[in-house]
């Protein structure tokens, strides 16, 4: 299938030079970009008769598909369920854990589908999921059906709290925790061997673990080593809050990143989620190891993680680290809209440090596209509009009020636009969102089922006004 999208008003390529093409045309052949350039040049190189489909792009602007570097598909049914007054540790141990324990395999599949449908409406074409709480097969099959590009795995942890926290049960403990690191690693290896490379390589499977206190140091180090042996990656939460860092220092004499680094747990195949509480020397350790970071600005804002006060993301990027953006789970980040994260990161460090040169629109867009792709080990194939790369892209409707009028398209994408003006989202050379609908799923039926299942999960989890909003778990 050869497709010509001609006379685009602009194309933000996010290539090495951040080239902005005005009056551009793009040739898509099957699942890849075959030619990109000025419309007049493309017309001279390709006969119109050679195309199976020609799309008038004169009212469209094109950007690379957005890449969500940290998301929880298993959490999608928890939208706006947890209180608005939780710090990170209370949110995890007293609300998220009981919720996850109540999610069945069928719930998880429905949550994954509705999460991915929302992603497509928001221009996201690729994601890194923390992993299934139940049967990975169901989530993999959901990704295959919806058509997104993604990475998933089997969620793993191996350190139980010394005492069962309020609201937890022994059944819940068995659901969440493997008996030890070795059994967790065996399951991770099986999962990777079963599912990595599904759907012609569009779906990858990693050795993902929860990270931080619910995982032993052996599991942190072992997951990365296993991933290296299998030729895949791993991701986990670490340094997610100053509270976590202080507990780590009191218990182990080191902050979280330094502790894992001392044990040999950092590496180029590791994506650390959040990474809010780090010291300067830990940035050096991560940079030297090639470790990547997924920053979730909206979660930091809601859970008071302190990114604007103690976060060192500008320093990480200045050191040469790949820092992508993530939406996290909807109970923390609010939704699957990576454009919201892009807007936040473009401006939050300007404001908190009173330095208007920090981050900005150009860097924010790179974080949401190419740097996210590099973090996920997919930088050679996606993340920018370049010949030979996969045809994953977003078309904005420039006849929308968000674009009437506009000057600099780069600033307009980051500061002015929203998913409301997204006309189409393409993955692998296929338009998965167009005409106001996701074409691979019955969205109305999906929303109805998601609402029903969400209410049942919350009831089974016992999440009520009596659920604690502070915690001493793992202290």
Predicted regions and their residues:
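Active-site microenvironment of metallo-dependent hydrolases
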Residues: 1-24, 29-34, 45-47, 366-475
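Divalent metal-coordination and catalytic microenvironments
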Residues: 8, 26, 31, 59, ...
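Active-site gating loops and adjacent loop-to-helix segments of metal-dependent hydrolytic enzymes
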Residues: 77-110, 158-179, 242-267, 289-292, ...
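His/Asp/Glu-enriched, well-ordered alpha-helical/loop segment
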Residues: 262-269, 314-400, 416-417
């Amino acid at each position: 299938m050869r497709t010509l999208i001609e006379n685009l008003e602009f194309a933000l390529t996010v290539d090495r030079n951040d080239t902005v093409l005005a009056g551009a045309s793009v040739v898509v052949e099957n699942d890849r970009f075959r030619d990109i350039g000025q419309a007049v040049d493309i017309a001279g190189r390709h006969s119109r008769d050679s195309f199976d489909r020609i799309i008038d792009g004169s009212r469209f602007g094109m950007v690379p598909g957005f890449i969500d570097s940290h998301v929880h598909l298993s959490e999608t049914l928890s939208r706006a369920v947890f209180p608005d007054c939780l710090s990170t540790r209370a949110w995890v141990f007293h609300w998220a854990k009981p919720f996850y324990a109540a999610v069945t395999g069928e719930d998880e599949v429905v949550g994954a589908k509705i999460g991915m449908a929302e992603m497509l409406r928001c221009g996201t074409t690729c994601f890194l999921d923390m992993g299934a709480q139940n049967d990975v097969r169901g989530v993999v099959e959901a990704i295959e059906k919806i058509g997104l590009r993604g990475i998933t795995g089997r969620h793993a942890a191996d350190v139980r709290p010394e005492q069962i926290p309020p609201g937890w049960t022994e059944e819940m403990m068995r659901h969440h925790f493997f008996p030890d690191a070795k059994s967790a690693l065996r399951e991770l290896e099986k999962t990777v061997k079963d599912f990595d490379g599904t759907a012609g390589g569009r779906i990858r499977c990693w050795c993902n673990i929860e990270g931080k206190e619910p995982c032993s140091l052996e599991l942190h180090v072992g997951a990365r080593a296993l991933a290296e042996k299998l030729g895949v990656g791993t991701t986990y939460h670490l340094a997610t809050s100053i509270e976590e860092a202080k507990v780590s220092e009191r218990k182990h004499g080191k902050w979280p990143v330094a502790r894992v680094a001392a044990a040999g747990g950092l590496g180029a195949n590791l994506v650390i989620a959040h990474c809010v509480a780090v010291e300067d020397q830990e940035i050096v350790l991560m940079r030297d190891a090639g470790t990547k970071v997924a920053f979730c600005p909206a979660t930091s804002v809601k859970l008071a993680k302190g990114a604007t006060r103690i976060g060192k993301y500008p320093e990480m990027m200045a050191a040469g680290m790949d820092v992508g953006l993530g939406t996290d789970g909807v109970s923390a980040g609010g939704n699957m809209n990576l454009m919201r994260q892009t807007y936040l990161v473009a401006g939050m460090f300007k404001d908190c440090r009173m330095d208007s040169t920090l981050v900005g629109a150009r860097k924010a867009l790179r974080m949401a596209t190419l740097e996210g792709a590099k973090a996920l080990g997919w930088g050679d194939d996606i993340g920018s509009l370049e010949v030979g790369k996969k045809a994953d892209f977003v078309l904005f409707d420039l006849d929308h009020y968000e674009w009437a009028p506009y000057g600099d398209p780069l600033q307009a994408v980051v500061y002015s636009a929203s998913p409301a003006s997204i006309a189409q989202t393409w993955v692998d050379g296929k338009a998965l969102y167009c005409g106001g609908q996701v074409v691979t799923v019955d969205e109305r039926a999906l929303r109805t089922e998601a609402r029903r299942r969400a209410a049942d999960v919350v009831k089974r989890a016992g999440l009520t006004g009596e659920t604690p909003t502070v915690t001493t778990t793992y202290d």
